[in-house]
């Protein structure tokens, strides 16, 4: 879980806050800029982390971005030139919300999934002894501008009791494939922390997100009860043209994989398919890094991609493996970042997507190759047009930033692509002094959105 107390409702901008490179003293490291690259800041400085983004499959000028503090949504209808912050996504009955994710269905309905609660658990471990809470989904019928008055409940623990399970890190996905027999289904998976274990849960909606099935355990083997000592973490899913649902997560030692071919009713036994280093690791100048896997699919060919980060080379790199046989076998890992191996420079917090229009695979990540001190990252976008065998790296941000004031940027970012247009969303440490209130320095991160324009591969 990426939430860090204390939480507060910051004053959010209702429209675009443009970035100012003049206030920063570092220049872009020598990578080519992504084609048509634009990067905008959509929040004021505050406690903002863990964003996600989704594109309207009918129109790639329209997209919805989400992030915490709380469960906040912003939307664009002009290919990311301007963004507006939506009202009505914050849960009314709980003190805190977060771990937000977003999907958009074939009709342009947007879905935001998030957890909500009053307090985390004991100081020694946040998931133990927490208060009442649950997992909720809110729907927008107009591309993110307005949201349903009441959220739908996936699972809820309405009263604080000893040893309540903790629902964490939901990830939501919509079946938008016109040839799928389950088109219109919406799926959500998440971690449940219990006193003695972690398990991966799943629920589905067949009525446009209004109601949700009883949660089911889809992890064949449970994990340890803490995320930083071998717990299960990072449910992610992708849908093929025929409606097959593929899902991954980390079990602390590798990528775990499972499949549903009946619209989320049943799943194959989950199994580890790729060996990796543990997903949580220390990174200089950060509180921690997270390398848990992300899955994407080229829907027509069924080629599966899994990306992750680990330190097998002595510093942190980004890797991708692919499967051409629906997950039965997997390729050897391809190193995505193209700086020299073993150079002591970290790349981390990857996210992946595949453009369904042409099968191009994209990975976004923080990259510190250009800083001799291995502190200041830029944001890099990598593209593969050969089925994941190689990646071209592009700079998406003009300048690096210093993360040391905040040190915590969350556990994940967001990426989406359609018809050559790529949207990314990530937090950065604002390069202006943090506000001090009541003698305490406030959190000072901002949410940024990048757009790039690539020609479709032939």
Spans of model-derived segments:
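Bacterial N-terminal signal peptides that target proteins for export
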Residues: 1-11
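Bacterial N-terminal signal peptides
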Residues: 9-19
């Amino acid at each position: 879980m990426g939430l860090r107390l204390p939480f507060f409702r910051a004053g959010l901008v209702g429209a675009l806050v443009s970035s100012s490179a003049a206030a920063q003293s570092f220049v872009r490291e020598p990578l080519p800029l992504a084609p048509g690259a634009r990067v905008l800041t959509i929040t004021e400085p505050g406690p903002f982390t863990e964003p996600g983004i989704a594109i309207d499959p009918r129109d790639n000028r329209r997209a919805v971005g989400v992030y915490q503090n709380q469960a906040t949504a912003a939307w664009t209808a002009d290919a990311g030139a301007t963004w507006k912050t939506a009202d009505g996504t914050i849960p009314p009955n709980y003190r805190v919300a977060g771990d937000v994710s977003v999907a958009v269905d074939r009709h342009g309905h947007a879905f935001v999934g998030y957890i909500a609660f009053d307090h985390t658990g004991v100081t020694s471990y946040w998931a133990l002894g927490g208060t009442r809470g649950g997992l909720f989904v809110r729907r927008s019928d107009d591309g993110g501008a307005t949201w349903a008055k009441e959220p739908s409940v996936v699972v809820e623990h309405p009263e604080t009791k000893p040893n309540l399970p903790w629902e964490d890190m939901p990830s939501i996905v919509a079946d938008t494939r016109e040839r799928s027999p389950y088109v219109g289904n919406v799926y959500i998976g998440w971690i449940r922390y219990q006193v003695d274990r972690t398990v991966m849960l799943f629920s589905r909606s067949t009525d446009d997100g209004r109601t949700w099935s009883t949660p089911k355990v889809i992890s064949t083997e449970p994990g340890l009860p803490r995320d930083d000592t071998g717990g299960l973490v990072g449910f992610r899913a992708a849908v093929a043209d025929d409606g097959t649902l593929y899902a991954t997560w980390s079990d602390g030692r590798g990528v775990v994989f499972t499949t549903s071919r009946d619209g989320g009713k049943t799943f194959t036994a989950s199994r580890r398919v790729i060996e990796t280093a543990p997903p949580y690791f220390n990174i200089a100048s950060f509180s921690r890094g997270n390398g848990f896997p992300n899955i994407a699919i080229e829907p027509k060919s069924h080629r599966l991609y899994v990306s992750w980060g680990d330190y097998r080379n002595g510093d942190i790199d980004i890797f991708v493996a692919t499967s051409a046989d629906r997950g039965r076998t997997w390729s050897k890992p391809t190193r995505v970042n193209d700086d020299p191996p073993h150079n002591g420079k970290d790349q981390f917090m990857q996210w992946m997507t595949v453009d369904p229009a042409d099968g191009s695979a994209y990975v976004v990540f923080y990259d510190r190759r250009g800083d001799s001190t291995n502190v200041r990252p830029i944001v890099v976008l990598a593209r593969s047009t050969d089925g994941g065998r190689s990646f071209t790296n592009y700079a998406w941000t003009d300048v690096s930033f210093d993360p040391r004031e905040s040190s915590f940027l969350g556990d994940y970012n967001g990426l989406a692509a359609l018809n050559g247009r790529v949207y990314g969303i990530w937090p950065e440490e604002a390069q202006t002094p943090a506000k001090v209130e009541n003698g305490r320095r406030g959190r000072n991160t901002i949410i940024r959105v990048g757009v790039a324009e690539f020609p479709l591969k032939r």
